Structures are given as C-alpha cells and as structure tokens.
Amino acid sequence: MLKKIERAQQLLKKEAAVFRCPTCHEPMHVEGVGLICQQRHQFDLSKKGTLYFLNHGVQTEYNKKMFTSRGKMIQSGMYAPVLNKIMHYLPQNKTVVDVGCGEGSFLAELSQAGLSGLKIGFDLSKEGIYLASNQLIDAFWCVADLTNLPFANEGLDTILNIFSPSHYQEFRRVLKDDGTVIKIIPEENYLKELRAAFYPNDEKKQSYSNQKVVQRFAEELAVEVDERITYCFDIPEERRLDLLEMSPLEWQVSQEVKAKLQQRPLEKITIDVRLLVGRKR
C-alpha cells in the first residue's frame, strides 16, 4: 500500500499542469518530492502528502477540535439533502476544487456519493488540511490563499464554495470558459436553535441576512440555479455535543451557557441554505 506522500507524488506527476506558482505565477513541474517553477520557487510535499503554498504564516481560530466536531456532524448525515442537490450539478471525470474545505468532509461525502475525476481541497488552516489528509478518498489537499490561488489559468471545471468566502476575480481566472461555481450560503433560519441557545438575549445574533452575498454572486457570475433548501435534522444522540463545537458560533459563548447545553443538548437542528450555481459570463 502506498504511503500518503507517494500517492500525492503520483498525482502531481499526472496533474502538475493544474498548478501555478503562487509567488511568480509561472507554471510548475514535479521535481523531487514537490513542485518547482522556472524561477526555482519550490513547494515540497509533507509526510502527509499535503502541499503548503503560503509564503507567510497564518493564524486562524479554526482549530483541530472544531474541525473534528464539524467532520462528525457532516458524517452523521446532517447535510445529506444539501449534498444530494449538489451532486446534481457536479460534472463527472472533471477537475473539482473545494475552496475552504476544512477537514475535507464535504468532499469526502461527495466522493462516496460517486463524484469522480480530479478532486482538490484547500484551506487556509494547516490543521484542517492535515485532518483532510486522513480522508479515505482519492484527493489532493493543500494549504493556500483564496486571494492568490495556486492554480493555472482556465484549468478548473468546478469550484465548490460551501460556507466559505469567495474571491470572484480569482475564480474567473482559474475556471475554464464553461466552468461553474457551486456556492452554499446560510439562510436566516440556519442553525436557529443553536443560535437561540447560545445567545438567548442577543437578537442580532439570532437573525441575519445574506442577501448581499447572493446579490454579489449574481453580479459576478451568470446564475443558473438559485434554490433554497430547508429541513429539520434529528441529531443522533452521540453527536449532540459535537453540534455545540462545530462552528464559529461557539467562540463567544459564555462557559455558563456551554455547561447548560452540555447537560441538556439540542435534539433537533434546522438546516436552511441557499444553493447557487453560477457560470462564467
């Protein structure tokens, strides 16, 4: 059985043309245990088979504990109806990049549902990507910057953008002429029970609108699909504590509130999201 770094080397040899140097924007080729460009900027694979494309350190509040809980909730089926919808719009045997993939659970679930082709996940969080490298799927994982994607011009078929920021100028650059962006945006009732439990006295945190995000998407891309997906999910008993720690909502919650919820965790949660599919104009 091949080691992770050996599997990653094989993929790079086959797919090196997909990448470009994030420092000088020149093409790259495989040399040794990584990629190198004509200007000799070199990016070596880690033992886990991941690539670090940043030339600077990054501090994020997204940590291993949060990513682990998020992964368990995704694997529990919490987002299954959303992922089933996404599968309708994903091409087969093409190149798909998951932007802001975290621990890689969404890409893993889609792969298990039948997604084929070259799959790449990237995130700004090194911890998230190290966890993603443990996913039992054929995919490539890297740490990269959304504003300076390490991908060649017009080389990608689809960008997955699930609960993560967008950079449409870069998206248009790296997508093929017929390429698509599939974006999932939280709607007003998303995780409403959790927000109410975390912040019972803060109405601002219990209601919000992403209409500006939807408008921006429509300004940047030709919208082909705009669909709202809403349902209530029965949380498996063994996953109820993971729900409390799976998102940034938890960061500002008092210890007193957390303790109460750990004693009496939520049993149901509302999923309310917008599915957008846009194509380059």
Segments and roles (model prediction):
Residues G179-N189:
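Conserved beta-strand signature within the Rossmann-like core of class I S-adenosyl-L-methionine
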Residues Q59-P81:
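Class I SAM-dependent methyltransferase Rossmann-like catalytic core
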Residues E103-L115:
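Conserved SAM-binding loop of SAM-dependent methyltransferases across substrates and taxa
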Residues T147-T158:
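A short acidic, Gly/Pro-enriched loop at the edge of an enzyme's catalytic core
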Residues M1-Q59:
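N-terminal auxiliary segments of SAM/dcSAM-dependent transferases
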Residues D123-E127, T147:
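Conserved SAM/SAH-binding beta-strand->alpha-helix loop
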Residues N93-G102:
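Conserved class I S-adenosyl-L-methionine
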Residues E15-A16, I229-R281:
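Conserved Class I S-adenosyl-L-methionine
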